[in-house]
Amino acid sequence: MKISEYTKEMMDENSFIDLAYMALSEKGKEVNLYELIDEFKAIGNYSDEEVETRVVQFYTDLNTDGRFLSTGEYMWGLRDWYSVDDIEEKIAPTVQKFDILDEEDEDSPKIALLGEDEVEDELDLLPSDGDEENVDTEDEEVEDELDEAGLVVEPDEEFEDEEDEFDDEEEEE
């Protein structure tokens, strides 16, 4: 019996993944995922809400069931149709090729090396000596509130010693 001859009851008895296997076996060619779902919706007279509840599981099953193979964007076929070499070609990741730069290219202002912009942006964020723009205003507000309340915060000497060591290490670099 062809899937197009199924009744609503027969559609309800089967999972979408089993129906997809039957549909792909009948067609003998890869099919778009959305076409499959639309076909199931039409045959089973499903509402949009009914389809939505089943589609999530269906898509998960398609990806985990070894009988199916994604052959492109939203295209699915049966793994049995393809040789091992074909499968490797279909699912092999695309490798991007880059030109190798020599020292002259690296000095060119037209070429930005990977990560170069990020480093410059990070350097802009670092406070420099006498740079009042980078003072954290939130810290100033907290200090003002403490002064107004008459609270005295004593510095943690151990913390300051560690901070001094950290500053010394940064200067050495």
Curated annotation (Swiss-Prot):
Acidic residues composition bias: residue spans: 115-173
UniProt xrefs under PROSITE patterns: HTH_HARE
Cellular-component GO terms for this entry: DNA-directed RNA polymerase complex
Residue span(s) of domain HTH HARE-type: 14-81
Classification via NCBIfam families: RNAP_delt_lowGC (TIGR04567)
Function: Participates in both the initiation and recycling phases of transcription. In the presence of the delta subunit, RNAP displays an increased specificity of transcription, a decreased affinity for nucleic acids, and an increased efficiency of RNA synthesis because of enhanced recycling.
Known partners and oligomeric status: RNAP is composed of a core of 2 alpha, a beta and a beta' subunits. The core is associated with a delta subunit and one of several sigma factors.
Name of the protein described by the UniProt record: Probable DNA-directed RNA polymerase subunit delta
